[in-house]
Amino acid sequence: DEDWMDEVGLLIHEQVDVYNKTNGNRPTTYVLPLPRGSNEVSVNGAGAHLTEVGDELIICSYIYLDDNYEVMPLRHEPRIKLIDPKDRMYRELLGLN
């Protein structure tokens, strides 16, 4: 859901790791947008064989470096959104450092 991408700062085609809490699989994949307001996360490609509807997932992204190897953005703060079983965001966790 592009709304969720905006909420947590994910970019289209950004590499992410998907930690499947249900079965322990940890595929690396990339982000593709779903329609705003769809409240959906979809795992496609090879990663789709490692997840099932209803699995609990943790999606992790990492910092980026510019052409001068400077960290972008200059200030990084984790932003975590918790999703309920009906795929609604219900809580935000910030600044876990």
Predicted regions and their residues:
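Helix-rich terminal scaffold detector
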Residues: 35, 72-97
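Compact, glycine-rich, soluble single-domain proteins
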Residues: 2-68, 85-86
